[in-house]
Amino acid sequence: MANPLYQKHIISINDLSRDDLNLVLATAAKLKANPQPELLKHKVIASCFFEASTRTRLSFETSMHRLSASVVGFSDSANTSLGKKGETLADTISVISTYVDAIVMRHPQEGAARLATEFSGQVPVLNAGDGSNQHPTQTLLDLFTIQETQGRLDNLHIAMVGDLKYGRTVHSLTQALAKFSGNRFYFIAPDALAMPQYILDMLDEKGMAWSLHGSIEEVMADVDILYMTRVQKERLDPSEYANVKAQFVLRASDLNGARENMKVLHPLPRIDEITTDVDKTPHAWYFQQAGNGIFARQALLALVLNSELSL
């Protein structure tokens, strides 16, 4: 089938329409059910990680290998010309784009991925995270997991917990879910880490219901998805961190009264905001969520690198 994502840069979740999202998710489901080990044979993909990554880098590179793409790149910019000799990002991308069919890039600077698109020519750039700005492929695997467990992406009740101010995953996921109808959001965070006003304004503009809460217990019985994030110690005064840390920890006993099919998600890594006794409950789904990153990223790579795709 012809697809609108061929050679498209994927920098922000807002680069994808609702139809685009549905296309990626449908493709991911097909690849999970029916692997296509030679789909990207003869393609060369650059995996350019200018900062450390575990799940995202390994997930992307596994996705590439399982589709038979050749992978080049680096996991740390310290030993590159950019890191050792002061080469500009623009020159680095200009050169790399002459070698490869696509560039997957993580960078600590917000806006770096968008900047890279100005120097990559016809080679698509896929953002694997740029600072605290965007992480669109995390959102795709989140959506895939929600759809897989709940059977839909509309008319859901979603709670987001923890660092909602600086956490790029919750911003992107809220923006993506707002493209679907009837979703209702519960935001649970300390005042210092509340969801940014621009996200709340966006929900108001779309007529989406949302509310603010001080504890997980307030909403446990009402939600389909509980999306946990880490409260970042470095963002808070030490005394304030000590106060809020215990308030936003999920324990197995907190799941009493939860809906039978409610799933707990987390972008990982977790520190201590989900106790290990939760892992043994049927609600825990964060490791399966991480595994779905393979299929979401395979789908995106396949669509970006094939003008027509028949699965």
Swiss-Prot record:
<dbReference type="GO" id="GO:0044205">
    <property type="term" value="P:'de novo' UMP biosynthetic process"/>
</dbReference>
<dbReference type="InterPro" id="IPR006131">
    <property type="entry name" value="Asp_carbamoyltransf_Asp/Orn-bd"/>
</dbReference>
<dbReference type="InterPro" id="IPR006132">
    <property type="entry name" value="Asp/Orn_carbamoyltranf_P-bd"/>
</dbReference>
<dbReference type="InterPro" id="IPR036901">
    <property type="entry name" value="Asp/Orn_carbamoylTrfase_sf"/>
</dbReference>
<dbReference type="GO" id="GO:0016597">
    <property type="term" value="F:amino acid binding"/>
</dbReference>
<feature type="binding site">
    <location>
        <position position="269"/>
    </location>
    <ligand>
        <name>carbamoyl phosphate</name>
    </ligand>
</feature>
<keyword id="KW-0808">Transferase</keyword>
<dbReference type="Pfam" id="PF02729">
    <property type="entry name" value="OTCace_N"/>
</dbReference>
<dbReference type="GO" id="GO:0006520">
    <property type="term" value="P:amino acid metabolic process"/>
</dbReference>
<feature type="binding site">
    <location>
        <position position="135"/>
    </location>
    <ligand>
        <name>carbamoyl phosphate</name>
    </ligand>
</feature>
<feature type="binding site">
    <location>
        <position position="56"/>
    </location>
    <ligand>
        <name>carbamoyl phosphate</name>
    </ligand>
</feature>
<comment type="similarity">
    <text>Belongs to the aspartate/ornithine carbamoyltransferase superfamily. ATCase family.</text>
</comment>
<feature type="binding site">
    <location>
        <position position="168"/>
    </location>
    <ligand>
        <name>L-aspartate</name>
    </ligand>
</feature>
<feature type="binding site">
    <location>
        <position position="106"/>
    </location>
    <ligand>
        <name>carbamoyl phosphate</name>
    </ligand>
</feature>
<dbReference type="Pfam" id="PF00185">
    <property type="entry name" value="OTCace"/>
</dbReference>
<feature type="binding site">
    <location>
        <position position="85"/>
    </location>
    <ligand>
        <name>L-aspartate</name>
    </ligand>
</feature>
<feature type="binding site">
    <location>
        <position position="55"/>
    </location>
    <ligand>
        <name>carbamoyl phosphate</name>
    </ligand>
</feature>
<dbReference type="GO" id="GO:0006207">
    <property type="term" value="P:'de novo' pyrimidine nucleobase biosynthetic process"/>
</dbReference>
<feature type="binding site">
    <location>
        <position position="268"/>
    </location>
    <ligand>
        <name>carbamoyl phosphate</name>
    </ligand>
</feature>
<dbReference type="InterPro" id="IPR006130">
    <property type="entry name" value="Asp/Orn_carbamoylTrfase"/>
</dbReference>
<dbReference type="GO" id="GO:0005829">
    <property type="term" value="C:cytosol"/>
</dbReference>
<dbReference type="InterPro" id="IPR002082">
    <property type="entry name" value="Asp_carbamoyltransf"/>
</dbReference>
<comment type="function">
    <text>Catalyzes the condensation of carbamoyl phosphate and aspartate to form carbamoyl aspartate and inorganic phosphate, the committed step in the de novo pyrimidine nucleotide biosynthesis pathway.</text>
</comment>
<keyword id="KW-0665">Pyrimidine biosynthesis</keyword>
<feature type="binding site">
    <location>
        <position position="138"/>
    </location>
    <ligand>
        <name>carbamoyl phosphate</name>
    </ligand>
</feature>
<protein>
    <recommendedName>
        <fullName>Aspartate carbamoyltransferase catalytic subunit</fullName>
        <ecNumber>2.1.3.2</ecNumber>
    </recommendedName>
</protein>
<comment type="subunit">
    <text>Heterododecamer (2C3:3R2) of six catalytic PyrB chains organized as two trimers (C3), and six regulatory PyrI chains organized as three dimers (R2).</text>
</comment>
<dbReference type="GO" id="GO:0004070">
    <property type="term" value="F:aspartate carbamoyltransferase activity"/>
</dbReference>
<feature type="binding site">
    <location>
        <position position="230"/>
    </location>
    <ligand>
        <name>L-aspartate</name>
    </ligand>
</feature>
<comment type="pathway">
    <text>Pyrimidine metabolism; UMP biosynthesis via de novo pathway; (S)-dihydroorotate from bicarbonate: step 2/3.</text>
</comment>
